[in-house]
């Protein structure tokens, strides 16, 4: 009897507790939607927001609740007085008036309190611009503030605002869709969703809310339901004067009076993919549908698969398992997986030799995922330098039609995965493009490569702290230098001189480097230097401004980027004008980095580079608008032992290039000559101090010495010859005849006709002590 009474008492207590337990999981008021980075919902004044839903059967007062942010409820906000009926939604803005704290883009924990009790909790994930979290669907690009978190609710929200002219579709990475004037430009499609004709010139497009009338549409009528395609080339005129970023962009339509008509957040898109609206819902399209009804597309992009083992060094057979949503397709030959590749059936992949596994997921109603690449390396413990792996389709890389055999084709590029393994661990893995790099060096057996980060492969830039001294970690392109024309000699002349000047010549642009062992589709290709490349991103990062405001000019007046008009005019000015005239002299100084020009020619002369006419200059028009010289292509350095300054500054033959005009013109000016000699004395005592140079040379040798035998064996070069060429570098710096520093001073005396007293005044003890 006592046991029966105890059982009934326990049941009664459980009955009392169950509602409280249920309330912790399913409360009447729940957080149903949230956006932490709102760039496009103008109806909410572009504010972040949180939506609450009354899931109960009685009305609720928001003022009974407190919203908290943080694991320890650090931020608290009493919700405003508002009645929420059963089945109704309430949208509150995180603008300081309704919710007093913001939603961090990296995500946060939200807790809803009713009195002292927890009513609802949510871990809001990190969101990209325009992404929304909903209780039913997780993260997507389909907002529905104030409406059900369903397709029907999303369409109702979109259609609740009348858009006379609406964005219909966008393509931000145009690889092969609808060429215009021999170029593939970004594209936007507009649709007349009003009931009558519209005059397009009444509307403006922009990618910047601070400039709502950035580009006026052309004068043209558009019928109801008709489409109009805009090419976002950045050129202006009949084409939009802005471009679209493949990593994500927000675009807006305004009327002349500043009234907004429509806005659309375009997510990150891959090559030829588009993003658009159909019947009030947002879709991704594998192929664009410009000029016609979009139809239903994909609801998103599949998440990339996971692999059970990471890239690394292995010495025993392994089994690699794949996991992910949807169907997984994979390859083991280096090629990129497609829908025709092998399907993963759940059986682990057996691996006992160097192999790259590449896989992608395809979920129903979603686009294929990005490709996951992992490389499993055998027999590579012997290498000391980091390992850089190029993985791709054999035919595209090393086959008869690949880039290596067709090295004369400067445009041919192959899609690859680039992976760096450092100290046995994967440092990064990125999809990108590769092509052969160089001029005459591409004829050599060991070729240099150019790495290009493009939207059609993945991201258009690559961010990683790759270099120790560069000061930047975002790249649009990189070079894999083979040693170029120095590959069968000392191998690192170019890197050596750059390493000497990087700290002491800050106004000479320096290309940082990192030595690695390169493997192409599992085959050893020797020691390479990963190098910065002088592209628009490099210049804008080092000199300021953006990529559109950069000019880059190669040797022999070859324009690479921007405009060369100002550079040509400067050379002509120096050729025709008397630079001893202070006005003319100051005009030149206003256009160049003075210390940079002086230091560059001192460094080049010290190195005895016989290819001295091959220079590269650049500037940022948004920076100081001055021309800077880049320290590059020094494979023929340390070869002219005598008369280095005379050879460099135009007193011998083979100096007909305009590249010498500025420096030789400036040296006619006594003030400039004095500054040139002063800086020469400074650098001979610091940058090119004999012991400093020899110590740096020892460091360069030690860095590659362990792995150099493998490089030499791969390309048929001997270690004995390499060591001989390294010794020649040492002898160049100092031998039994004296030092390079002394040769430089003696040549300066000859070139400028200086007396011994003048030399002593300029160079001090370096001259008097004969060192």
Language-model regions, residue ranges each:
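Middle-to-C-terminal accessory/interaction subdomains
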Residues: 274, 289-298, 386-387, 395-400, ...
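A structural motif detector for short, solvent-exposed N-terminal "entry" segments of globular domains
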Residues: 23-70, 102-105, 123-128, 147-209, ...
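Short, compositionally stereotyped local motifs that mark structural "simplifiers"
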Residues: 30, 92, 139-166, 170-173, ...
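Conserved ATP-binding subdomain of kinase catalytic cores across diverse folds
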Residues: 390, 397, 407-562
């Amino acid at each position: 009897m006592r046991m029966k009474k105890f059982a009934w008492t326990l049941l009664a207590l459980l009955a009392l507790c169950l509602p409280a337990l249920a309330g912790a999981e399913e409360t009447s008021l729940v957080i149903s939607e949230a956006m932490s980075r709102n760039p496009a919902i103008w109806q909410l004044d572009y504010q972040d927001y949180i939506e609450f839903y009354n899931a109960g059967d009685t009305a609720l007062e928001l003022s009974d609740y407190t919203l908290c942010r943080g694991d320890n409820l650090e931020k608290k906000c009493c919700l405003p007085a508002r009645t929420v009926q059963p089945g109704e939604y309430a949208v509150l803005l995180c603008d300081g008036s309704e919710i007093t704290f913001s939603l961090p883009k990296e995500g946060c924990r939200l807790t809803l309190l009713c009195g002292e009790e927890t009513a609802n909790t949510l871990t809001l994930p990190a969101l990209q611009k325009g992404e929304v979290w909903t209780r039913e669907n997780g993260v997507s690009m389909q907002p529905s503030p104030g409406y059900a978190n369903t397709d029907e609710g999303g369409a109702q929200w979109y259609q609740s605002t009348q858009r006379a002219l609406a964005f219909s579709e966008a393509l931000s990475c145009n690889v092969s869709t609808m060429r215009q004037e021999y170029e593939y430009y970004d594209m936007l499609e507009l649709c007349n969703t009003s009931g009558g004709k519209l005059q397009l010139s009444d509307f403006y497009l922009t990618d910047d809310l601070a400039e709502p009338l950035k580009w006026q549409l052309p004068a043209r009528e558009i019928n109801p339901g008709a489409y109009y395609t805009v090419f976002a080339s950045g050129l202006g005129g009949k084409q939009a004067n802005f471009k679209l970023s493949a990593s994500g962009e927000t675009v807006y339509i305004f009327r002349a009076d500043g009234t907004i008509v429509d806005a659309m957040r375009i997510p990150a898109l891959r090559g030829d993919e588009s993003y658009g609206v159909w019947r009030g819902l947002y879709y991704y399209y594998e192929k664009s549908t410009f000029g016609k009804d979009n139809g239903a597309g994909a609801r998103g992009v599949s998440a990339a698969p996971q692999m059970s083992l990471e890239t690394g060094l292995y010495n025993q057979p392994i089994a690699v398992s794949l996991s992910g949503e949807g169907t997984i397709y994979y390859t083991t030959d280096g090629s990129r997986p497609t829908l025709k590749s092998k399907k993963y059936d759940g059986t682990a992949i057996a691996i006992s030799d160097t192999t790259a596994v590449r896989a992608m997921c395809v979920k129903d109603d979603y686009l294929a995922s990005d490709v996951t690449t992992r490389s499993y390396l055998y027999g590579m413990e012997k290498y000391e330098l980091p390992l850089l792996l190029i993985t791709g389709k054999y035919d595209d890389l090393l086959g008869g039609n690949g880039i290596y055999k067709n090295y004369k084709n400067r445009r041919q590029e192959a899609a690859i995965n680039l992976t760096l393994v450092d100290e046995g661990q994967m440092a990064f893995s990125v999809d990108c493009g590769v092509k052969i790099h160089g001029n005459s060096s591409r004829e050599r057996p060991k070729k240099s490569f150019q790495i290009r980060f493009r939207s059609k492969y993945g991201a258009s830039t690559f961010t990683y702290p790759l270099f120790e001294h560069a000061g930047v970690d975002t790249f649009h392109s990189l070079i894999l230098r083979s040693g170029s024309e120095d590959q069968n000699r000392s191998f690192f002349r170019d890197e050596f001189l750059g390493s000497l000047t990087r700290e002491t010549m800050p106004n000479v642009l320096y290309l940082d480097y990192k030595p690695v062992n390169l493997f192409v589709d599992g085959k050893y290709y020797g020691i390479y230097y990963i190098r910065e490349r002088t592209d628009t991103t490099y210049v804008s990062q080092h000199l300021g401004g953006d990529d559109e405001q950069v000019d880059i000019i190669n040797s022999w007046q070859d324009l690479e980027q921007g405009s060369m008009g100002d550079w040509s005019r400067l050379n002509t000015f120096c050729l025709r004008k008397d630079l001893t005239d202070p006005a003319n002299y100051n005009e030149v100084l206003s256009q160049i980095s003075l210390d940079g020009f002086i230091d560059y020619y001192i460094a080049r002369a010290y190195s005895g580079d016989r290819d001295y006419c091959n220079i590269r200059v650049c500037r940022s028009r948004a920076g100081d608008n001055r021309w800077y010289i880049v320290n590059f292509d020094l494979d023929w350095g340390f070869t002219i032992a005598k008369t280095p300054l005379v050879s460099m500054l135009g007193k011998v033959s083979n100096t007909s290039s305009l590249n010498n005009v500025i420096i030789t013109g400036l040296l006619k000016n006594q003030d400039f000559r004095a500054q040139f000699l002063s800086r020469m004395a400074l650098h001979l005592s610091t940058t090119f101090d004999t012991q400093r140079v020899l110590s740096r040379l020892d460091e360069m040798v030690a860095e590659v010495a362990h792995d150099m035998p493998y490089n030499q064996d791969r390309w048929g070069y001997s270690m004995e010859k390499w060591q001989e060429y390294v010794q020649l570098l040492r002898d160049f710096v100092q031998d039994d005849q004296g030092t390079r520093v002394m040769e430089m001073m003696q040549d300066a005396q000859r070139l400028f006709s200086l007396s011994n007293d003048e030399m002593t005044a300029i160079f001090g003890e370096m001259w008097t002590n004969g060192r």
